[in-house]
Curated annotation (Swiss-Prot):
Zn(2+) 2 binds at D58, H59, D128, H166. Pfam families: HAGH_C, Lactamase_B. The keyword ATP-binding does not apply. Pathway: Secondary metabolite metabolism; methylglyoxal degradation; (R)-lactate from methylglyoxal: step 2/2. Its cofactor is Zn(2+). SUPFAM superfamilies: Metallo-hydrolase/oxidoreductase. This is Hydroxyacylglutathione hydrolase. Binds 2 Zn(2+) ions per subunit. It catalyses: an S-(2-hydroxyacyl)glutathione + H2O = a 2-hydroxy carboxylate + glutathione + H(+). Keywords: Hydrolase, Metal-binding, Zinc.
Length: 252
């Protein structure tokens, strides 16, 4: 069984540390090195590898220093993104073995053109593609690409734990309630999230089951969501609904 620890970074980033019961570990999307190095020292851990989901600086900024400190580590990341420190470029359908667990690489373009996610041991590391109650902005890809990427993730088992890279849940829920103000589950969950955040606690990981109930970007087939954007779309396809939601969220 793999153990997951969050390493907070910047204002709202999570760097994820994956380890088993020995003193070896892997980190996902280390945007800065200092908090990773501090965590390794505190817990007596040895860094074996780095997993990267996409090329944005707040996800790779710490890689050069970590490579200097651990010159023999593997740096795994998307084959179609400009990341010069990669030692193992990977793409959709490839596998990465971590502590005797196989993680599959999923192509989830949209936020960036080559964004990938990693799924294994019922744990999903999805960078900036799927957030709790939200999704990433379309910096490089299209709405259609992001829609299909999210559908790919939504097809994962309900019990899948979702480890996204930012603590955006509270603000995302405010938007979700603007879309579905009569969603009782959303209202109750937002109250829970606000209590957690008031106490300085994380809302991540979430689960795929929960996201299907609270995330408007995974609920594009729901009549309530379609109705919320009916004046903003030319047709009622799910892709058009998603695109309208994303435009609305950008301005929210």
């Amino acid at each position: 069984m793999l153990l997951i620890k969050s390493i907070p970074a910047f204002n709202d980033n999570y760097i994820w540390l994956i380890h088993n019961n020995d003193n070896h570990c892997v980190v996902v999307d280390p945007g800065e090195a200092a908090p990773v190095l501090a965590c390794l020292k505190e817990h007596g851990l040895i860094l074996d590898a780095i997993l990267i989901t996409h090329h944005h600086h707040d996800h790779i900024g710490g890689v050069p220093e970590l490579v200097r400190q651990f010159p023999n580590i593997n740096v795994v990341g998307p084959e179609n993104e400009p990341i010069p420190t990669l030692t193992h470029p990977v793409g959709d359908g490839d596998f990465v073995e971590l502590f005797n667990e196989k993680f599959m690489v999923l192509g989830v373009e949209g936020h960036t053109k080559g964004h990938i996610a990693y799924i294994g041991d019922e744990k999903l590391f999805c960078g900036d593609t799927l957030f709790s109650a939200g999704c990433g902005r379309l910096f490089e890809g299209t709405a259609e690409q992001m829609f299909h990427s999210l559908q790919k993730l939504a097809a994962l088992p309900d019990e899948t734990e979702v480890y996204c890279a930012h603590e955006y849940t509270a603000s995302n829920l405010a938007f979700a309630l603007a879309v579905e103000p009569d969603n009782d589950y959303l209202q109750q969950y937002r109250e829970k999230v606000l209590r957690l955040r008031a106490n300085g606690k994380a809302t991540i990981p979430t689960t795929m089951q929960r996201e299907k109930l609270i995330n408007p970007f995974l609920r594009t087939s729901e009549a309530s969501v379609k109705q919320a954007v009916s004046s903003k779309v030319e047709n009622d396809s799910e892709v058009a609904t998603f695109a309208a939601l994303r435009r609305w969220k950008d301005e929210f």
